[in-house]
Amino acid sequence: MTLHVIETARVTPTDYSVINSANLHKLPLTFFDLPWLLFQPVKRVFFYELTESTRDHFHSIILPKLKDSLSLILRNYLPLTGHITWEPNEPKPSIIVSENGVVLVTIAESDADFSHLSGYGQRPLSELHALVPKLPVSDDSATAFSIQITLFPNQGFSIGVAAHHAVLDGKTSSTFIKAWAQICKQELQSMPENLTPSYDRSLIKYPTYLDEKMIELVRSLKEDQTNIRSLTSLPSSKLGDDVVLATLVLSRADIERLREQVKNVSPSLHLSTFVIAYAYAWTCFVKARGGNKDRSVSLLFVGDFRDRLDPKLPGTYFGNCMIPVGCYNRKAAEFMEEKGFVTAAEIISDLVKGLSSRKIETIADTFVEGFSFQSWSTQFGTIAGSTRLGVYEADFGWGRPVKVDIVSIDQGEAIAMAERRDESGGVEIGMCLKKTEMDSVVSFFNNGLHS
């Protein structure tokens, strides 16, 4: 695969006068944002197939519409043009927006096979990463957001986004993409009210000590303690050429059959689609890793608290509003044995129930305590994305995406999750592994559905 970068455009909001009225020069991070301060960016790729995708058509029609609509929507998403800083006299970092803020948009062209890269089978991770831009970060400043638009001549194009996780979570990112798509497709001149982001941090009420706890947790992950205010990301995992990304699918019927398996053993559980899909994917993940059955494994996911706070936050709240919850230091044998799937479903069900029944301080304290005692040798499963984000609704005027991938699941053994593109109630599950291990996961996954 050869990628040719054509230009790096600096897209500014259409009218910066909005800054003054929005009072968004400075947006402090909350304790929901702080756990992600030093994590690698969240990287996602949207693939769009085109019936007409010549260079002339792309550069004269498609690209100008994408840039113009992006400029329009940035009026309402000013923090995406900013960067994170941690001023010497401040107890925690903030997002700073300036009048010369921009979103960098890389324009590129690829000679890769579009249908293969946008498919569901095993694809080289390196080729997918090439479709996502860099997100500049240093000790003193961390860029919030960047975009890459890549043309595959006579095939289609992709939109790759890199987002700093301390700036926005998956819901905010997905809402932004869908709002941008709507403005582009309908050629709107202003943001629909139901998509307008809310920046009111005063709605989030919590003890200030939680800020300090999250900052201490983040600091504990740094090897170099000489500059405790450094915003430089934690080192990324170095992956070989044999690492692939694949998307496995659970149909609605698959979910129902798996749900019945659990009900027959534990009828009183909370068995949402998320619980079933995560439990099944996780057990396949652990079985494929194999090894010592007494080895330590931990599983983690994040709960969205927009509807769980008092008062509730608007659905369009900008930023992170998630707390990680998890089950730590279990034995791999629990998930490798015959009833491993049911065990995983029981654990995840209890964790989901606890999101509504426990105080936010208790959940945060439990996360900090559990995460602090993790060993680097522990197999640690996490979830990126959700079946509720509606990522396949992002139609810019040339049809819905044929595929959406979260490329950053290569960092930390994450499992990506999204709604199935062409079936209500189905689930797409993305995994990133060495090819030999991926083959094993796929085998466990498919055999389990047909046994």
From Swiss-Prot:
The record places the motif (HXXXD motif) at: 165-169
Q: Listed GO molecular functions?
A: O-malonyltransferase activity
Q: Does the keyword Acyltransferase apply?
A: yes
* Swiss-Prot/TrEMBL catalytic activity: a flavonol 7-O-beta-D-glucoside + malonyl-CoA = a flavonol 7-O-(6-O-malonyl-beta-D-glucoside) + CoA
Active-site positions, per UniProt? H165 (proton acceptor), D395 (proton acceptor)
Cite the EC number: 2.3.1.-
Report what the protein is called. Answer: Phenolic glucoside malonyltransferase 2
Q: Which organism is it from?
A: Arabidopsis thaliana (Mouse-ear cress)
Lineage from the top down? Eukaryota, Viridiplantae, Streptophyta, Embryophyta, Tracheophyta
* Gene (UniProt): PMAT2
